[in-house]
Amino acid sequence: MTNSLSAESARVGSGLRIGVLALQGDFREHLRAAAESGAEGVSVRRPRELDGLDGLIIPGGESTAIDKLARAFELAGPLRERIAGGLPVYGSCAGMILLASDIADPATDLSGAPQQTFGGLDMTVRRNAFGRQRESFETDLDFKGLEFSATDADVAPVHAVFIRGPWVERVGPGVEILAQVEPADPEHASHTAELPGAARIVAVRSGRLLATSFHPEVTGEKRVHELFIRMIRGEA
C-alpha cells in the first residue's frame, strides 16, 4: 500500500536542501523520498556537510552504530548544536531514539558507558520495544497533522511498518503525540508490565522536530516526509 504525492505535493520540497545522516541504516530510501518531493537530498557524513541544510533526516538502522559513528566522524557535537539551534529534524526508528532526551534501556559499550543521543525531544524511549526482527509487523495508524492530504474531508490512515521499533514511554509538556498503536502481540512486546493494555506512542512532534517509530520510506508512504517538509517551510 502506498500514498503517492499529488502533482502539487510532489514539488512541495522544491528549492530545499534536506540532509540525510548517511552513516548507517536505510539512508538511501530517505534520500529517494527527499528527491521525490522535489528537494535536493544530501548525504551527511562530515560536520561541514551540515552547512546550508534546510532540514535533516536521521534514518532507521542501529541507533548504537549511528551513535558510535557520529562520534568517530566528529558529527555528534555539531549535530547536537544544530538541533538545539533550531534545525528541523525528522528521526525514523533509530532516528527517534537518537532524538530522545532519555533512553529507558540504553545499550552500553565495553567500558559500561551508555549510548548517547543527540537530544532535542523531551521524551523517554525504549529500544526494540515491539520485539525482535521476526516480530516485525504492519498496521494502519490514525496520524495527526496530515489534514493537507484529506480527500472528501477524510484523512486516509498511515500504513506503518515496525521493524524492531522503539516506542515512547514518556513525553514532556512540549511534545505532541501524533500516533499511537496497540502492540500487535503483547506476548512478544518487550517490557509491558508497567503499561499493561496501554496504547504505545509511535509518533511525536515538538516544534520543528518530528519522530516516528516506524519506516514510512519502506512502504512508499510519502505523507510523513511531506509533513516534515511543510514543517521546514512553517506551513504545518
Swiss-Prot record:
Stored SUPFAM superfamilies: Class I glutamine amidotransferase-like
Gene Ontology cellular component terms for the protein in this record: cytosol; glutaminase complex
InterPro entries assigned to the protein according to its UniProt record, in alphabetical order: Class_I_gatase-like, PdxT/SNO, PdxT/SNO_CS
Family: Belongs to the glutaminase PdxT/SNO family.
Function: Catalyzes the hydrolysis of glutamine to glutamate and ammonia as part of the biosynthesis of pyridoxal 5'-phosphate. The resulting ammonia molecule is channeled to the active site of PdxS.
Keyword ATP-binding among record annotations: no
Name under which the protein is recorded: Pyridoxal 5'-phosphate synthase subunit PdxT
Record: residues binding L-glutamine: G61, E62, S63, R127, I163, R164
Pfam families: SNO
Record-level Gene Ontology MF annotations: glutaminase activity; pyridoxal 5'-phosphate synthase (glutamine hydrolysing) activity
Catalytic machinery residues: C93, H215, E217
Keywords per UniProt: Glutamine amidotransferase, Hydrolase, Lyase, Pyridoxal phosphate
Functional pathway: Cofactor biosynthesis; pyridoxal 5'-phosphate biosynthesis
Entry superkingdom: Bacteria
GO biological process, one term: glutamine catabolic process
Assembly mode: In the presence of PdxS, forms a dodecamer of heterodimers. Only shows activity in the heterodimer.
Keyword Ribonucleoprotein: no
Annotated PROSITE patterns: PDXT_SNO_1, PDXT_SNO_2
EC number: 4.3.3.6, 3.5.1.2
Catalytic activity: aldehydo-D-ribose 5-phosphate + D-glyceraldehyde 3-phosphate + L-glutamine = pyridoxal 5'-phosphate + L-glutamate + phosphate + 3 H2O + H(+); L-glutamine + H2O = L-glutamate + NH4(+)
